[in-house]
C-alpha cells in the first residue's frame, strides 16, 4: 500500500476508534451461515469478539480456514483469548482460525492478499463502514475468482409496513448506501 493511500485512511482509523467500546458495533446479531462452506477460506469482517468466527470455523471444518478481522484491538485480543474454549479444535485452533486487526477499508493491515478468500462474511456491520465504496472494493480485491460476498444486515421497519413497502425501504437503503449505483426491482418511488 502506498503512503498516500495509508494517509487517506487516517480519518477512517479515527472513525472506528470513536465508536463506543461499551456498545460495540450495534446491530442485529442473528447469524445465518451459508450451508456450503466446508473446506472454504472465509474472512469475517468486523468480527467483534469472535463469536461468529467460531461458528464459521466450525462450518468450514478442518480443511477450511477463517480469519476474523476487527478495527478494535480489545475485540481482537478478546477473540484470541476466547478461542481455545469456544472452538472445537481446542488448542490446535490456530490451524483453522486467526484474528487480526484491520479496518474494512484496508484489509492489507492483516496481511490479506489479493484473491485469497472464497467468502467474505459481514454480519450486521456494513452500515457502519467509514467508506462503503472503499470497503466494497477491498472485499472484491480479496475474493478469489468465483468467491462470494455474504452480507447479513438487519432492516427494521414499522409493524404495519406491507411486503412491497419493506422491499422499497430495503432498496432505498441499498441505493443510498451505495450512492445510487445499485437498485432493487420495485424499490424507490
Where are these regions (language model features)?
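Helix-to-beta-strand junctions that scaffold the AdoMet/dcAdoMet cofactor pocket
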Residues: 61, 129-130, 143-144
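A short SAM/SAH-binding and catalytic strip from SAM-dependent methyltransferases
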Residues: 118-132
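Conserved class I S-adenosyl-L-methionine
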Residues: 148-173
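A short acidic, Gly/Pro-enriched loop at the edge of an enzyme's catalytic core
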Residues: 105-120
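Conserved alpha-helix/loop element of class I SAM-dependent methyltransferases that forms part
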Residues: 12-41, 51-55, 59
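A short glycine-rich, Lys/Arg-flanked "PGG" loop and its adjoining helix->strand segment in the class I
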Residues: 133-148
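Class I SAM-dependent methyltransferase SAM/SAH-binding core
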Residues: 41-44, 48-108
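Short alpha-helix
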Residues: 177-189
Amino acid at each position: 500500500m502506498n503512503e498516500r493511500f495509508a494517509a487517506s485512511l487516517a480519518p477512517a482509523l479515527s472513525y472506528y476508534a470513536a465508536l463506543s467500546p461499551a456498545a460495540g458495533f450495534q446491530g442485529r446479531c442473528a447469524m445465518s451461515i451459508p450451508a456450503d462452506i466446508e473446506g472454504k477460506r472465509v474472512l469475517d469482517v468486523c468480527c467483534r469478539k469472535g463469536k461468529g468466527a467460531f461458528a464459521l470455523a466450525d462450518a468450514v471444518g478442518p480443511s477450511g480456514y477463517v480469519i476474523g478481522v476487527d478495527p478494535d484491538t480489545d475485540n481482537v485480543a478478546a477473540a484470541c483469548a476466547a478461542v481455545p474454549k469456544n472452538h472445537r479444535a481446542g488448542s490446535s485452533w490456530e490451524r483453522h482460525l486467526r484474528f487480526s486487526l484491520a479496518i474494512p477499508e484496508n484489509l492489507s493491515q492483516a496481511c490479506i492478499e489479493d484473491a485469497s478468500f472464497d467468502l467474505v462474511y459481514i454480519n450486521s456491520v456494513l452500515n457502519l463502514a467509514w467508506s462503503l465504496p472503499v470497503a466494497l472494493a477491498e472485499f472484491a480485491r480479496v475474493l478469489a475468482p468465483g468467491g462470494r460476498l455474504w452480507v447479513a444486515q438487519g432492516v427494521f421497519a414499522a409493524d404495519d409496513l406491507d411486503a412491497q413497502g419493506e422491499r422499497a425501504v430495503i432498496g432505498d437503503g441499498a441505493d443510498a448506501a451505495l450512492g445510487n449505483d445499485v437498485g432493487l426491482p420495485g424499490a424507490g418511488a
